[in-house]
Swiss-Prot record:
Function field: Nucleotide-binding protein.
SUPFAM superfamilies: YajQ-like
Keyword terms, alphabetized: Nucleotide-binding
InterPro entries registered for this protein in UniProt: DUF520, UPF0234_N, YajQ-like_sf
Pfam family of the protein (one): DUF520
GO cellular component, one term: cytosol
Name of the protein described by the UniProt record: Nucleotide-binding protein Rfer_2692
Organism: Albidiferax ferrireducens (strain ATCC BAA-621 / DSM 15236 / T118)
């Protein structure tokens, strides 16, 4: 029975390279000289550190540009709150989304059921598997998901006949 998986995964290698390039640019830019501006990647969290909110937004803009150059969708980034740390410093944690959240998976599953396309959707941990009798039905389900779900970058893999 033909099937495919719907996933939401960023290339962590490209994210790492974008963070490294952002670090290089921060160290060479004149407006960041003598400031504690920094960016750091640990697991799937990017930590921005700076003097003020304005500096954090500049670092974030640099990061977004570097990610875009590496073809990583910026919708993978989930911004956290700006926190004050010792002195005048502030930090912000940005999480890199990896996997489809349960709520979104249920929304996609409901969308497929309501569309009356003859396919079944099953939630499997951080991905959604869609199976159907015909390849055309699966392609129709893909088109429906691409059209209606825009808040996160979804991709399709593991297409089997």
């Amino acid at each position: 029975m033909p099937s495919f998986d719907t996933v939401c995964e960023a290339s962590m290698v490209d994210v790492k390279h974008a963070v490294e390039n952002t670090t290089k640019e921060i160290t060479t830019r004149f407006d960041f000289k003598g400031t504690p501006a920094a960016i750091e990647l640990k697991d799937k969290e990017i930590t921005l550190t700076g003097d003020a909110d304005f500096q954090l937004s500049q670092i974030e803009d640099i990061l977004r540009n570097k990610l875009t150059k590496r073809s990583v969708d910026v919708r993978f980034l989930d911004k956290g709150e700006v926190q004050k740390i010792g002195g005048d410093k502030v930090k912000q944690v940005i999480k890199v989304r990896n996997g489809i959240e349960t709520e979104l998976a249920k929304k996609i599953q409901r969308l497929i059921k309501d569309s009356k396309i003859k396919v079944q959707a099953a939630i499997q941990e951080s991905k959604l598997r869609v199976t159907g009798a015909k390849r055309d039905d699966l392609q129709a389900a893909m088109a429906l998901i691409k059209k209606d779900i825009t808040e996160v970058p979804l991709s399709f893999d593991n297409f089997r006949d």
